[in-house]
Amino acid sequence: MATRSLFHSLRCRLTNNGVLGSNFIRNAESSRFSKSYNADAAIGNSLVEESEEKDDLKSRIFRLRLPKRSATTVLEKWIGEGNQMTINELREISKELRRTRRYKHALEVTEWMVQHEESKISDADYASRIDLISKVFGIDAAERYFEGLDIDSKTAETYTSLLHAYAASKQTERAEALFKRIIESDSLTFGAITYNEMMTLYMSVGQVEKVPEVIEVLKQKKVSPDIFTYNLWLSSCAATFNIDELRKILEEMRHDASSNEGWVRYIDLTSIYINSSRVTNAESTLPVEAEKSISQREWITYDFLMILHTGLGNKVMIDQIWKSLRNTNQILSSRSYICVLSSYLMLGHLREAEEIIHQWKESKTTEFDASACLRILNAFRDVGLEGIASGFHLILVHNKCSLENEGSS
């Protein structure tokens, strides 16, 4: 189960950092997934340091530090001193607490909001509470809270939040039962994020064959897929070596009305990865390796996480994923080197790309493949990215990589 846990921990970074995991995804185009776990910790430390110089409400709450101390007590004292607070201020404090993993204090702030500002509580506020309850008290408590909401509060956002909680805890049967309720609902409208949660769950538990079923329902419901939807769909095809279907999906993406610069970058990089890695349909006959090791199929799903973040222009997450993969006890595949190398090149980070070349050459377990580098070079040229290809060519020359048969690789 170690490999699936690794995949789940990496995938959760896509979905765990917003109000439901869903608001974060909705806002990802602007935020570019700029907050990683280490960045969140740094934010928390800076807020604590800042709080020692200020005496506003947020500073008092962040000075609590220990989870056993009560944010409710701080709020009551603040009001008792004759101070005021707005619900938007409380939302912002709760958001900051979530970002720094202060879930208990964040939950206490939302509880105050419900008790004192119930008329102003939004669907997103209830969704946030479901997510926080699941983190603080467990999935059963989150489920009870959701079922106890009145009918008007059981919205697309709260349904999706509970589905996210099920997915995060790998509660497949519960998630499937809830998803059935969701797709049978006639009164609520769900977006791509809800379907993405279900596909993320299937990917994390190794049931990749169920991803196309979710896509089929999404299309029946006439829900527009987003780049995360496509990434999950493509990942499932690559993981099962269904490369013909993968190419069809890429073509569909090219003609999607939502296509933008990030999508084009994603499409180009996927094509480069498939061509330079030489992934073929024939590999679907390969046996899956023992559970204790990472199979080729699982490596490919990790690679597609990196491809997604490249499409979003988020170097921080590429760094984070690559570091996580290097820190495992598994032997890195040549495909993984090809993927991270292509990702850095696509975003114009030549210094990092050259560092990957050095790591690959110095690896004691994965032999450096100069011919793969030439395939990357030619693949960038094939999609019309001659400038990137030229920069990579210089890196190869500088590092004395063989360029024999360059035109035919």
Curated annotation (Swiss-Prot):
It comes from the Eukaryota. Its main location: mitochondrion. Pfam families: PPR, PPR_2. InterPro entries: Pentatricopeptide_rpt, TPR-like_helical_dom_sf. It comes from Arabidopsis thaliana (Mouse-ear cress). This is Pentatricopeptide repeat-containing protein At5g09450, mitochondrial. Belongs to the PPR family. P subfamily. GO terms for molecular function: mRNA binding. The keyword Metal-binding does not apply.
